């Protein structure tokens, strides 16, 4: 039966080329937009390489100081982090990092680069794929060695396609030696950078023991998925008498990537609000699907009306309304899946165009063209969206068809 439905679907598509083109256009554009949007969300919150431990990784990027009922938020300093959150019992390892930018001028071309100061533990928490060399280790961090791990994009810029290991390049007037080359992380990730160097080469480190404000973040890899233990231990460490003078209390904020996204999308910078985030994302997805679904419903109603004689003949030979509803819904789902596959293909080019468009606003610091990656999660979500769109746009016209008067249908008219 399904085989016959598939054959009939293609015959109808070829017979009604105008409606087929409109339907496929609406579906493919809808799925294209949904795919790009889903890919963006997936790159932010999912455990994609090199951040394979995102579910149990916390980013500590803010400290709140309370004094006389007033609150002051700041990015913590390296000295504050090293003094107060090292050797946590609930964590497997802790890494410190900060991101800066520097400009290079090569072969008449000016380019901006993202520079990340970090430590040896950064490479234990993440899982970067090294195409050349290796990461820097504890001794190199302790000694303040001017060594660097660079991305493939940075290698292509400074060294073309030649081997980069052992070669030097300038960063803010100082020469760094390349010891490793990695595939880039997502530009939407906290671990993204063009160049990674030991934090001990950072001349802007806050060295004062009492300094609280700075530019550094901490990445905490929990031993288990129970992140409440890490947060409880952090709260116990923030004993004001032993940490910071001249304030009443101190609070640090450490969240996973999902929680970071939830904070930003719910307009609450202190705590994640999943309910509000789900509402915001849900509204966006509904808007993406509702408008084209309404258009497809109208097209399907018209298309079914033009098949009135066919429907009348089938009814007169004993086909039930349920049989016809199943047929038309399956036809619509098949067409929707075809449009969805086209939409997935279009999303690849659309994402590249979007990146090029974004790069026009900042020609120095350009995003990689492969910033949007279609993972199996995105593919599965888009497949589900196709099925949902097919059902939404097909059930109502099919139900209307089931009420069609047989006599009107056989005369070539309809009472839809």
Annotated model-derived regions:
Residues 5, 25, 376-416:
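C-terminal membrane-exit region of the final transmembrane helix in multipass inner-membrane proteins
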């Amino acid at each position: 039966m399904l085989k016959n439905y598939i054959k009939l679907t293609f015959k109808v598509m070829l017979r009604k080329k105008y409606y087929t083109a409109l339907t496929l256009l609406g579906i493919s554009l809808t799925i294209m937009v949904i795919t790009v949007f889903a890919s963006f969300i997936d790159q932010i919150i999912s455990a994609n390489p090199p951040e394979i431990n995102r579910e149990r990784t916390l980013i500590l990027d803010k400290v709140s100081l309370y004094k006389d009922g007033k609150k002051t938020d700041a990015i913590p300093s390296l000295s504050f982090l090293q003094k107060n959150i090292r050797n946590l019992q609930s964590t497997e390892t802790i890494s410190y990092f900060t991101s800066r930018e520097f400009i290079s001028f090569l072969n008449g071309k000016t380019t901006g680069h993202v520079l990340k100061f970090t430590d040896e533990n950064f490479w234990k928490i993440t899982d970067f794929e090294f195409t050349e060399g290796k990461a820097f280790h504890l001794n190199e961090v302790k000694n303040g060695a001017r060594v660097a791990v660079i991305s493939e994009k940075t290698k292509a810029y400074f060294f073309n396609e030649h081997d980069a290991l052992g070669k030097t390049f300038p960063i803010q007037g100082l020469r760094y030696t390349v010891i490793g080359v990695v595939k880039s992380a997502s530009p939407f990730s906290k671990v993204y950078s063009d160049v990674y160097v030991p934090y001990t080469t950072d001349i802007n480190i806050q060295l004062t023991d009492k300094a609280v404000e700075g530019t550094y973040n901490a990445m905490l890899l929990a031993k288990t998925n129970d992140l409440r233990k890490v947060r409880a231990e952090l709260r116990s460490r923030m004993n004001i008498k032993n940490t910071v003078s001249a304030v009443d209390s101190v609070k640090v904020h450490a969240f996973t990537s999902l929680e970071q996204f939830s904070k930003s999308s719910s307009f609450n910078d202190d705590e994640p609000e999943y309910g509000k985030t789900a509402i915001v994302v849900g509204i966006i997805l509904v808007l993406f699907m509702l408008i084209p679904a309404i258009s497809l419903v109208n097209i399907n109603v018209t298309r079914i009306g033009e098949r009135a004689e066919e429907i009348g003949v089938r009814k007169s030979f004993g086909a039930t309304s349920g049989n016809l509803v199943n047929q038309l819904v399956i036809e619509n789902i098949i067409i929707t899946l075809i449009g969805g596959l086209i939409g997935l293909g279009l999303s690849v080019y659309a994402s590249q165009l979007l990146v090029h468009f974004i790069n026009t606003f900042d020609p120095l610091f350009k995003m990689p063209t492969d910033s949007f990656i279609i993972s199996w999660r995105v593919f599965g979500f888009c497949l589900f969206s196709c099925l949902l769109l097919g059902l939404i746009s097909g059930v109502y016209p099919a139900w209307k068809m089931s009420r069609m008067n047989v006599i009107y249908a056989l005369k070539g008219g309809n009472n839809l």
